[in-house]
Design a protein with these regions (language model features):
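All-alpha prenyltransferase/terpene-synthase fold signal
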Residues: 1-202
Length: 202
């Protein structure tokens, strides 16, 4: 097919970006100065580009124009960002029975999420000292650490900050989707997919 070279180029580019994102994620484990901008870039590379790649490949194979294929790529990119941020939120405030795994795993592992990085940037005085104590306490009990750090997140407004970021990327995904020429039926299917992934509880 005529689109094969473009598909192979996109595949190779995406593979390299995912490797890069995974390396960033590993590097973040030993860094205490990770910024929210770096985190967003990491999840873009590790997660979002794969969703964008899948959408663009499908569009190209189906004979879509470059403009439509690129808009679908961007839809996937922003959807991936919103999806990962929602995952960060669910790990703290989700319902265990619905989420399908224990809540607070990221907190117990000091995983650099949108919530922890934002809290580290915003916390001052007693809040900063308390957050550092929990991060440095290797023997903290889940029953104590998770509620305490969750309370810190709430006090620092991190739930609201995450929800705002999710909505921003959700809106950007819909904006990109609005530029795609497709039937009303196909558009509605994409709309429901975006709503389902971003509004998920598990």
């Amino acid at each position: 097919p005529a689109v094969l070279p473009e598909i192979m180029r996109l595949f190779n580019q995406t593979a390299m970006e995912i490797y890069e994102g995974q390396q960033y994620d590993m590097d973040f484990e030993v860094r205490n100065n990770v910024t929210l901008e770096e985190y967003i870039d990491m999840i873009r590379l590790k997660t979002s580009v794969l969703i964008g790649c899948a959408r663009k490949m499908g569009a190209l194979i189906a004979g879509a124009s470059e403009a439509n294929a690129q808009a679908l790529y961007e839809t996937g990119l922003y959807l991936g960002l919103a999806f990962q941020l929602q995952d960060d939120v669910l790990d703290v405030w989700g319902d265990e029975a619905t989420f399908g795994k224990a809540i607070g795993g990221d907190i117990m592992n000091n995983k650099k999420t949108f919530l922890l990085i934002g809290a580290m940037q915003k916390a001052q005085g007693d809040d900063a000292n308390e957050l550092r104590r929990w991060i440095n306490n290797e023997y903290a009990l889940r029953s104590e650490k998770v509620p305490a750090v969750t309370a810190l997140y709430e006090r620092l407004g991190m739930r609201e900050a995450a929800d705002e970021a999710i909505k921003r990327y959700d809106d950007m995904a819909f904006d990109a989707l609005s530029r795609v020429e497709m039937s009303d039926e196909a558009r509605e299917a994409f709309v429901q997919l975006i709503k389902g992934l971003v509004g998920r509880k598990k």
